[in-house]
Amino acid sequence: MRDLLQYIACFFAFFSAGFLIVATWTDCWMVNADDSLEVSTKCRGLWWECVTNAFDGIRTCDEYDSILAEHPLKLVVTRALMITADILAGFGFLTLLLGLDCVKFLPDEPYIKVRICFVAGATLLIAGTPGIIGSVWYAVDVYVERSTLVLHNIFLGIQYKFGWSCWLGMAGSLGCFLAGAVLTCCLYLFKDVGPERNYPYSLRKAYSAAGVSMAKSYSAPRTETAKMYAVDTRV
């Protein structure tokens, strides 16, 4: 059961870290809505904006100004949150790899490997927090901006909605939460053994064999009184 839970958590951690990294460095956080009067598809990301012509499929991208330039608060905060989530998710996944039983790292220390899995789970839980905050906040801001324009009957010729990069960030964050929950909440399921499992199997087997041989070789000495009593009982 322990191995199965570890592999499930590793599966979610791998794809979650990948989703977060792809979401951070792709350009479709905002995409023009279907009701926009545009002949091209516009996508806005955290680092650049791309336009794809609907007729010939030509795609052109323009990078934003320098990082030190003034940017909207939504863009700056989302960048910081997603980069933090990427680093933590990657670190959590690599840490989890060291804690897997199939990895030849500290093979004689199962208790330490369980602790490594616990640290990886806690890191993944922490990684999901900035990821989900950044993704949801960006999506809500896009929705509120669009709803405000519609409410005040303001039409700028193009309306935006959040795109697949935003969805990918949410999925990666939820995956981090799930992997972290499996590793932390199920930690006691990993401890399905007693204290003797802190020693390698070969040593436990050697100790057991030595104990059996010592028990067989040892016989309590018989006193003279016991011998006399045995003779009397036979008579």
From Swiss-Prot:
The answer to keyword Transmembrane applying to this record is yes
| Reaction equations catalysed | Mg(2+)(in) = Mg(2+)(out); Ca(2+)(in) = Ca(2+)(out); Na(+)(in) = Na(+)(out); K(+)(in) = K(+)(out)
Disulfide bond sites: none
UniProt KW keywords: Cell junction, Cell membrane, Disease variant, Ion transport, Magnesium, Membrane, Primary hypomagnesemia, Tight junction, Transmembrane, Transmembrane helix, Transport
> Transmembrane region positions?
4-24, 80-100, 116-136, 170-190
What, per the annotation, is the impact of changing A69V? In HOMG3; localizes at tight junctions
Q: Which PROSITE patterns match?
A: CLAUDIN (PS01346)
Effect of changing L81W: reported as: In HOMG3; retained intracellularly with predominant localization in the Golgi apparatus and further targeted to lysosomes
> What compartments host this protein?
Cell junction, Tight junction; Cell membrane
**UniProt GO BP:** bicellular tight junction assembly; calcium-independent cell-cell adhesion via plasma membrane cell-adhesion molecules; cell adhesion; intercellular transport; intracellular monoatomic cation homeostasis; metal ion transport; paracellular transport; renal absorption
Segments in the Cytoplasmic topological domain: 1-3, 101-115, 191-235
Report the membrane topology from the UniProt record. Multi-pass membrane protein
Domain text from the record?
Answer: The first extracellular loop (25-79) contains negatively charged amino acids that affect cation selectivity.
Its biological function?
A: Forms paracellular channels: coassembles with CLDN19 into tight junction strands with cation-selective channels through the strands, conveying epithelial permeability in a process known as paracellular tight junction permeability. Involved in the maintenance of ion gradients along the nephron. In the thick ascending limb (TAL) of Henle's loop, facilitates sodium paracellular permeability from the interstitial compartment to the lumen, contributing to the lumen-positive transepithelial potential that drives paracellular magnesium and calcium reabsorption.
Regarding protein family, the annotation reads: Belongs to the claudin family.
Complexes and interactors: Can form heteropolymeric tight junction strands with other claudins. Interacts with CLDN19. Interacts (via PDZ-binding motif TRV) with TJP1 (via PDZ domain). Cannot form tight junction strands on its own.
What is the designated name of this protein?
Answer: Claudin-16
